[in-house]
């Protein structure tokens, strides 16, 4: 399946419909982060940059390291030692 990079947001990349992450951390639910929901209108799935990490999240455990010490899936983020 073809993929493309996820949209950019003010200080990094869109990680989910309401999450924007960059080197300094993540914003969730802000006006800037909510712009990431535009990604849902594109039928081609996007690929988040960052090494793989696992979240203890029942619906989606396959996350990406999107900032120092932060692992995200499309709807939540958590601190993660594997991302340091």
Curated annotation (Swiss-Prot):
One of its GO terms (molecular function) is toxin activity. Expressed by the venom duct. It is found in: Secreted. SUPFAM superfamilies: Neurophysin II. GO terms for cellular component: extracellular space; secretory granule. Disulfide bonds join 6-46, 9-20, 14-36, 21-26, 53-71, 65-83, 72-77. Keywords: Disulfide bond, G-protein coupled receptor impairing toxin, Secreted, Toxin. Pfam families: Hormone_5. Belongs to the vasopressin/oxytocin family. Targets vasopressin-oxytocin related receptors. No effect observed when injected into goldfish or into mice. This is Conophysin-R. The lineage of its organism: Eukaryota, Metazoa, Spiralia, Lophotrochozoa, Mollusca.
């Amino acid at each position: 399946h073809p993929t493309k990079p996820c949209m950019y947001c003010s200080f990094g990349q869109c990680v989910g419909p309401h999450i924007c992450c960059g080197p300094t951390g993540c914003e969730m639910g802000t006006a800037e982060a909510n712009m990431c929901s535009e990604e849902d209108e594109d039928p081609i799935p996007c690929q988040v940059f960052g090494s793989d990490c696992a979240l203890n999240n029942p619906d989606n455990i396959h996350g990406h390291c999107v900032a120092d010490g932060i692992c995200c899936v499309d709807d939540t983020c958590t601190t993660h030692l594997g991302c340091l």
